[in-house]
């Protein structure tokens, strides 16, 4: 489960915080901001820095293709470190030690980009073994909360690429179901983030290798239409935006105009299911979830009520302090 906002981190717990399943593992990066208590401590996901290619480093750093001199300086530094088990610190040190004056300016600019990676906290001594993440009859949640978009995109790209490769080469023998929350951010209609290519490949041919894709989004209009049309079944909840309705209609041959008109009027928990999972479109009522919810919106009314109570308590404390001060002053005057 690709989880950008820590929505799925409590899958192992019931709504009253009891154990629900031992077959669920949460993975975090050191930069993940999700703060929660789980029966088991989350596993750390990290990437060995020397595993990154030049293109991957440039993408995560935000170095554009047109900055050819900066990219050349970065490539020169990587060439110096070639065949070594180098770290991010080694690359920074190599860029700093550039002695050639003609290359020093570009190396310094490259250094400014590369030093940003130190704050990302996803690079370690080893890359997390995918076979720790992929297990039979098991759910692994990748908590990407708090990561910059490019970093979250890179982690998603790397995980999905490794999953696809393992299944393509039959190095993991069981089918894999990949859930991508906020899918419009990873496979958008217009932009081309790093993970878009591998998601499109999985959508097109993944089922041949036992990799199945489940996209979750509130904005279907923002998802690449080729990928959306590859979804054989759709579970559609309330949609009021006309552009999103058009995207759903265009991606499903079984979505009639009558059904489309029903979408804005669906109540909470109601959905229309179309596609290969059902012979005809059906409307269903989805039961309440059994597991604890993560990443939910705050209860604004409750929070404001608590804020009001807190403010009143502080006012009372100030009044008591003033009374004490007046009492002390009166006592002093009496002397």
Give, region by region, the residue ranges found by the protein language model.
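P-loop NTPase motor domains
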Residues: 1, 5-203, 208, 267-275
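Non-catalytic surface loops within mature trypsin-like serine protease
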Residues: 146, 241, 288-290
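Short secondary-structure boundary/capping segments
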Residues: 14-19, 194, 230-232, 252, ...
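Conserved P-loop NTPase motor module
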Residues: 269-335
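Glycine-rich loops and low-complexity Gly/Arg-rich segments
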Residues: 24-27, 54, 71-73, 165-169, ...
């Amino acid at each position: 489960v690709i989880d950008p906002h820590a929505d799925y981190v409590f899958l192992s717990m019931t709504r009253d915080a009891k154990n629900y399943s031992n077959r669920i593992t949460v993975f975090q990066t050191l930069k993940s901001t999700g703060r929660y208590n789980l029966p088991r401590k989350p596993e750390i996901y990290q990437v060995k820095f020397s595993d990154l290619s030049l293109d991957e480093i440039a993408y995560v750093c935000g170095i554009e293709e047109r900055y050819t001199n900066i990219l050349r300086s970065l490539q020169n530094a990587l060439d110096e470190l070639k065949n070594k088990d180098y770290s991010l610190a080694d690359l920074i040190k190599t860029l700093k030690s550039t002695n050639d004056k003609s290359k020093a300016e570009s190396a310094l600019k490259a250094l400014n980009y590369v030093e940003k990676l130190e704050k990302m906290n996803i690079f370690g001594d080893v890359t997390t073994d995918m076979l720790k993440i992929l297990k039979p009859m098991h759910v692994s949640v990748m908590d990407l909360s708090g990561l910059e978009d490019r970093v979250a995109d890179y982690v998603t790209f790397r995980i999905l690429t490794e999953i696809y490769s393992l299944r393509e080469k039959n190095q993991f023998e069981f089918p894999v179901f990949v859930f991508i929350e906020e899918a419009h951010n990873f496979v958008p209609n217009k932009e081309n983030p790093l993970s878009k290519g591998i998601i499109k490949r999985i959508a097109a041919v993944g089922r041949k290798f036992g990799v199945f894709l489940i996209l979750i989004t509130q904005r279907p209009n923002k998802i690449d239409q080729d990928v959306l049309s590859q979804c054989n079944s759709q579970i559609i909840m309330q949609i009021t935006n006309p552009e999103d309705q058009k995207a759903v209609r265009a991606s499903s041959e079984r979505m009639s105009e009558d059904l489309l008109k029903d979408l804005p009027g669906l109540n909470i928990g109601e959905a229309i299911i179309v596609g290969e999972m059902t012979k005809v479109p059906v409307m269903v009522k989805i039961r309440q979830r059994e597991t604890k919810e993560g990443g939910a919106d705050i209860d604004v009314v409750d929070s404001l009520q608590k804020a009001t109570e807190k403010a009143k308590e502080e006012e009372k404390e100030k009044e008591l302090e003033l009374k004490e001060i007046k009492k002390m002053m009166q006592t002093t005057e009496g002397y």
